[in-house]
A protein has these predicted regions:
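The catalytic Nudix box helix
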Residues: 262-296
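Conserved hydrophobic/aromatic beta-strand scaffold that supports enzyme active sites
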Residues: 201, 247, 309-313, 329-331
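N-terminal strand-loop-strand
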Residues: 205, 215-261, 290
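Acidic pyrophosphate-coordinating catalytic loop
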Residues: 225-228, 253, 298-309
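Catalytic cores of DNA base-excision repair glycosylases
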Residues: 4, 13-200, 204-213
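NUDIX/MutT-family hydrolases
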Residues: 313-337
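Thiotemplate assembly-line natural product biosynthesis machinery
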Residues: 5-13, 239-241
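Short loop/turn microsegments at loop-to-beta-strand junctions
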Residues: 134, 233-234, 327
């Protein structure tokens, strides 16, 4: 692979057409961008597109402008500000990492960043190159797609992570790693998009094996889709005589850790959904309820499963609510939710 010409072509394209207005990439008075802002942005970008992240990042930086401010924040404040971005464990790990980084110099090597909660190899490489102009490779979705097309790789990239990391390391401009990594991401985000890649404007068109084959949109090769399993969740909106509803806070570990919810759980095989609600609320909160009327049914899909939430209104019969499978429980007025 002619890495020298490829690097020169991409950087020349990026100098003229790249996304130069990303706020966390802007230099401060010192001439360098803020490592804190870059770290926050890179974690937000792990599962979320740039245009979605931008307003969240702005609000975050206003609320927690420094590592010290984030470290001192209450976890519920952190989760509330993250609300809407999803994958809430990212916010919790940022909070934990801030408490580790507080009062310390910024890490300058890959191993130190990987030792922090919520930081993988690509995120660490992106922080080191973006914040400190260090020559570390990245391999996010955009870069993986660009490399798969450049080489017309005939297998799903997820099965060949080591191969793509080798390619990314080989194809890294060590004189301008900050700009080059951003250029790779910009190329994937603006020209070599998942659908309808804009090959005529691509600086790598003459070197691209997928373009030469006449089918760039067929790369990267996709895994055969597997049907997602469906789980039905019975949920109870429990009312007491004061008109309050019962909510509980999930354990920190696992999906949606630390968030508040109406209580409920998985339907067992052969079980009526009303029986699911009664059983789950007894097992998890030590209360007895009467299921009265259905309220709503909602479907939601994750990458690995589908969930159907079947929600019923319930009357509180007996038992003082206890957090047997959660952090805490609380009666609140509906207007305070």
């Amino acid at each position: 692979m002619p890495t020298g010409p490829l690097c020169a072509l991409l950087l020349a394209w990026w100098d003229e057409h790249g996304r130069h207005d990303i706020p966390w990439k802007q230099a401060r008075a010192s001439g360098q961008p803020d490592p804190y802002g870059i770290w926050i942005a890179e974690v937000m970008l792990q599962q979320t597109q740039l245009q979605v992240v931008l307003p969240y990042w702005q609000r975050w930086m206003e609320a927690f402008p420094t590592v010290d401010a984030l470290a001192a924040a209450d976890e519920q404040q952190v989760l509330l500000l993250w609300q809407g971005l999803g994958y809430y464990s990212r916010a919790r790990r940022l909070h934990q990492a801030a408490q580790q980084l507080q009062g310390q110099p910024w890490p300058q090597d890959l191993e130190a960043w990987l030792a922090l909660p919520g930081i993988g190899r690509s995120t660490a490489g992106s922080i080191l190159s973006s914040a400190f102009d260090r020559p570390f490779a990245i391999l996010d979705g955009n870069v993986k797609r660009v490399l798969a097309r450049l080489t017309a790789f005939e297998q799903p990239p997820a099965r060949h992570s080591a191969h793509f990391w080798d390619l990314s390391e080989q194809l890294l401009d060590r004189q301008r790693p900050r700009d080059f990594n951003q250029a790779r991401m910009d190329l994937g985000a603006t020209l070599s998009t998942p659908r309808q890649p804009d090959c005529p404007r691509c600086p790598w068109q003459s070197h691209c094996a997928a373009y030469a084959a006449g089918s760039p949109e067929q790369f990267p090769v996709k895994e055969s889709p597997k049907p997602l399993p469906l789980q039905v969740i019975g949920v109870g909106v429990v009312l007491n005589e004061a008109g309050e509803v019962l909510i509980d806070q999930r354990l920190n570990e696992g999906l949606l850790g630390g968030l508040w919810e109406f209580p409920g759980g998985k339907q067992e095989p052969g079980e009526d959904i009303e029986a699911t609600v009664v059983r789950e609320l007894h097992e998890e909160l030590a209360i007895e309820v009467e299921v009265t009327e259905p309220l709503i049914s909602l479907d939601h899909a994750y990458s690995h499963k589908r969930l159907r939430f079947v929600v019923h209104l319930c009357g509180w019969v007996s038992g003082e609510p206890k957090p047997l499978a959660s952090q805490q429980v609380r009666w609140v007025m509906p207007g305070d939710l």
